[in-house]
């Protein structure tokens, strides 16, 4: 099943993103020429990974009777160059309460298979195409 996300230019370095019935924005920090009205695309990319891990952790916790209040994921990342890209990501999963060593291993195994993490480990084919111009558009 193919799904679609649409990104439309707003102004400056700001773009509006439409996903199903949801709308969000991206921008650049003022130090990079933007207005800092929204996260950068790279920050959303990292947030996507962290939130995917968090979702899988929540589902695991619920299935195993582990508390979920206070469940959180923090993500630290650094950039690399040539080409510009995210070079390293470190995720820390904060789970309330004590987990046995077996639960810890199981939780890490489950969360490392979240959809976004799996996509990073097995990259999809990415095609960039130029859409046909609308007649009369400049």
Identify the role of each PLM range.
Residues 1-47, 55-138:
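Extended beta-strand/beta-hairpin segments
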